Amino acid sequence: MKNTSSSTTLTMNDTIAAIATPLGKGAISIIKISGHNALNILKQLTQKQDFTPRYAYVHDIFSNGVLLDKALVIYFKAPYSFTGEDVCEIQCHGSPLLAQNILQACLNLGARLAKAGEFSKKAFLNHKMDLSEIEASVQLILCEDESVLNALARQLKGELKIFIEEARGNLLKLLASSEVLIDYSEEDIPSDFLDGVSLNLEKQIASFKDLLDFSNAQKQRNKGHALSIVGKPNAGKSSLLNAMLLEERALVSDIKGTTRDTIEEVIELKGHKVRLIDTAGIRESADKIERLGIEKSLKSLENCDIILGVFDLSKPLEKEDFNLIDTLNRAKKPCIVVLNKNDLAPKLELEILKSYLKIPYTLLETNTLNSKACLKDLSQKISAFFPKLDTQNKLLLTSLAQKIALENAITELQNAKNHLETLELFSYHILSAIENLNLLTRPYETSQMLDSMFSEFCLGK
């Protein structure tokens, strides 16, 4: 796309424009314009001179006198906008070509094509949002976990900023008190003051650790729980995968060794992301390709969180079953022992199977041919292994930089607590903790750092 703007210097004073909606056809596309020239561009596009801020207008959109579309347009007057500048939105019909043509018209009238994250960067620099709120908005776009939506919404509302500001205010009071007492001799410092400061720090550290622990647990949850499906050939592993997906994803056949590699799919189970890994049947094989698949199956057990060990209930235990039992015992992972094909006459020696299993396990009899019933039973068994996270009234750190800053603040507060009787050192560590807290909401560093941070955001955001 050609930008005909005469300005070649990319500055925060430029008027920028971008398509804010995803690529592809849809009901509408949204073009955003931000900057001192935004309203003038909108006036030229619509051939309308008067716009009341925050009113929606349905109006024709023109480019060089040619009608492009009839669209919904809104003008947000500075500073009452997302970026803090004049912002105009054009909501046109959802043709990608049409949106591109309107965007090009904006560029022809003097706007510059926005860089990734530049709208958010303007909002940050104009003090419309702090870093925690901006990161929450990005994570809301990417979020795939229903349980974390509430925490992100609260962060977007500014509650993390309030929490950090309250903690910073508390530490500033402690710092002021210690600075006053530095000139006193140690014996003149009231013991109850030191006791009160120590208790204050313990509570502050505990609140920070709670935030950090919840954020780390949520990060692990976002990765998803890896669930490996293992068993001898033809035990019903692939049928089990298909039942959980409610579709034919893995090839099902009576021929042993049909699945020769791991197959991975992602599903949501009771609000949790689960990565299902269907593995090659575990048995002794002379086939080189199948052996590689079996080795990969065994490797997947090392990295999984839960194992589904599948046995054929309609057949007596044989060598391959005992090999599987040995594999489960050595893996030492949470295990659900699935007894498949319970629609057939049972021949598997269940008591012998139980006696050989040396790990905690949950037993489930099912029939993978009845997909819906199988999925319901499995969901109950699998979800019992998920850690219970209370997300109500919780705050969340969404970036590694925030977590490192909070970890450093905790370390400094612990150091301060250890140096309570040496007030110079105490003050030094309290001040360092405050500086780390500042990094959570407004990390004042260099323009290069800001460019790098916001470049991870999407266009139009």
From Swiss-Prot:
Entry GO terms, CC: cytoplasm; cytosol
List of residues binding GTP: 234-239, 253-259, 278-281
Keyword DNA damage: no
Binding positions for K(+) per the UniProt entry: N234, S253, I255, T258
GO BP terms in the entry: tRNA methylation; tRNA wobble uridine modification
Residues that bind Mg(2+): S238, T259
Residues the record lists as binding (6S)-5-formyl-5,6,7,8-tetrahydrofolate: K32, E89, K128, K461
GO MF entries: GTP binding; GTPase activity; metal ion binding
Coiled-coil annotated spans: none
Subunit structure: Homodimer. Heterotetramer of two MnmE and two MnmG subunits.
Family to which the UniProt record says this protein belongs: Belongs to the TRAFAC class TrmE-Era-EngA-EngB-Septin-like GTPase superfamily. TrmE GTPase family.
Name recorded for this polypeptide: tRNA modification GTPase MnmE
Gene it is expressed from: mnmE
